[in-house]
Every structure is written in C-alpha cells, then in structure tokens.
C-alpha cells in the first residue's frame, strides 16, 4: 500500500535506523502506520526507539479549520484536499454566518492537539464551526436565522474569499410574525371587549357602591371619635361597650354586689359590706318595734336645737338619767362607758360636727358610738364632752345671766 507524502518524508528521515512494528505506535490501530517496514529488512538490529510524535489527523494533513496568528483579521482557513495541497481563505470575518458564540477573542478557540497530550482517539476529532465577530451596536433580534449548508462549508475546489458566493441561500430573512397584518387582526379580536350593561343593572350597581361608601365613611368617623362623643347615630349610645367600661373602672376592680359601688382596695370593700350588715339589722329592729325610720339630719342645726342647748331644757334630764343609772349600780363600781348604737345617718356630732368613734360591742352584738349620748328625745347624738353642764335652779330665774353664761358655751362647742 502506497503511503502519502507526509508519511514518506517521515519514513525517509528514519531509514536504516528504526525497525517499524505494529506495537511501536499504539495510537494507530492499523492503516497507514500499522504495517511492517519491509524496505529496511537489512538494517542492523537497534534498540527500541521512542515513539515518534503522532500526527493530529490520520491523513497527516493540516487540520481542516485552523487560525493564523500572524494577523488579527479573524479569518478561518479551510485546507483543500485537491491537487496543490494548499490552504485558501474561504470564510471572512465580515461574512453573514451566524455565530456559535459572541466571543471576540480568537485565542480561546480550540487548538490542535499536541504530541504527548493529544486525543486518545485521534480518528475522532471535533470540528469547530465557523464564527465571526459581532458589532457592539448590533442586536440579536435583528440577526436572521442561519440555515447550515454542508456544501458551502467544505467545498472541494478553491474559491477566493472576496468573490465567495454560496450556491444556495444561506439566510432566510423572515419578518416578525407579531408584526404581520393577519396576526395583528387576530390579536385585536382576542382582546377583552367591554361588557355592555343595561340601565337598570347600572343603577343597581351604583346604588350598592354608594351604600358601601356610606358604611365605610361611617366606620371611619366612628373610629376617629371616641365612643359617646358622636351623636349622629343615637342607636350606638344604647349599645354596651365593654371596652369603654373596662377603661373607666380599670383602677377600681372591686364592686359591691348590693349597691354596685366600686372600690380600689379590699379594706374599703370590707367596710362597705359591714355597713350593709348594720343597715339591714337596724331596719329589722325598727320594723319589729314599730318605730318610724329615722330621717336624715339637716346640714345646719335647727332653731329649736339652738334654743334647747342655750336654755339646757331637756338635756339636763338626759344627762341626769345617765348619772342616776350609774349611781344605782353602786359607788364602788366604775362608771359604765357611755355609748349609743351606731347610726349611719348620724356619723358626726350634732354640736361639734366631729365624727364619732365607732366600735363593735360583743355584749350588745352591734356597732356602737363611744362616748356619745342622745341630746334630745328626737334622737340627736352628740359627744359627752359637748353636752352643756347642768345649772342650779336659782340660775333659771335670771335669764339674762343664763344667756350670758350658756350662749358662749354653745358657740364654743359649734366652733370646735
């Protein structure tokens, strides 16, 4: 089998020096480099020489596509396999081929395999696609689609790059389908058309919208003003607002179950409940004895009270009644403490207007006023120390003297 020019040159260089065998070049699985060298059968036996650098392609020719680093014109070169075995420029950078990428750097292009670092299977070598450099002001949408044509990429005859014209059209300039007249009409028909409503339905929708806006306005007004300050809607004042009640009585958590009064602490609440007990007991006692309930006292002392205190009329009898009771019990015994049952209507003295000292008597099982007596039969309660002193009978004959002595004492008691 005859060999090509590339292999013959290599064979002549190694003539009479190396015996070529199949195992010397394992990269080739037969074919051009896989035969026994018969022309050098008389060569002396030599040591086994290092395997020669393998060609990138089996045919031994230059790669089909490669770049020339001498200039920066981004021109791809196609090696011709015809008669003269020389490469010609076929595709220029300004041609209208679509690119595989938009990388303007040609140094990153796939380089041929080097000896010792080559492809383990040199028979299958990927062939790169031609590419060119894009202009910066050229958008991708304006580029037409590329229809590949194998006959124009690898011609079997040399063609000059300046006069290169493909046999078949390479590009198909198709307009944007969205700009087509038929497409525009279809899109306009598919758009949402306005709905035509009747007059009655339009009036109903407007009425509903007005009511909704009115409710929204009322809600905003009610939220802006506190509860109870807006009188536009009287029905809202009759509604029990728990939040408002809690805010008013948040600092008074305790409430009386009988009258509804509220208190801040437990001590005040306990005193109030004791008052209810005494009040109920006094009412029962009055009902049992057939007495009329006592009326509330006036703010000021009456004229009869002033005259009674000035003359010392019946007050002497009341005081002497208490004194006689003490004398009957015996002189050796200590005098009994004067006290009267507590009355919620008379908490202060009728003369000095000072509060009475209240305590609970276990003997009488009731709340009592300490050091207090009845001033008159009407039930006026005064302090013992505020009672006027009894006068002798001769003093009653001199009213002027009595007035001069007793009136200042009454005025002094009231001033206290």
UniProtKB/Swiss-Prot annotation:
It is found in: Nucleus. It comes from the Eukaryota. PROSITE patterns: ZINC_FINGER_C2H2_1. GO terms for cellular component: nucleus. It holds the Pfam family zf_PCFS4. Residues 1-80 are annotated as: Disordered. The keyword Kinase does not apply. One of its GO terms (molecular function) is zinc ion binding. A zinc finger (C2H2-type) spans 254-276. InterPro entries: PCF11-like, PCFS4-like, Znf_C2H2_type. One of its GO terms (biological process) is mRNA 3'-end processing. Residues 70-80 have a biased composition (Low complexity). Keywords: Coiled coil, Metal-binding, Nucleus, Zinc, Zinc-finger. Residues 199-220 form a coiled coil. Residues 1-17 have a biased composition (Polar residues). Forms a complex with cleavage and polyadenylation specificity factor (CPSF) subunits CLPS3, CLPS5, CPSF30, PCFS4, PCFS5, CSTF77 and FIPS3. This is Polyadenylation and cleavage factor homolog 1. The gene is PCFS1.
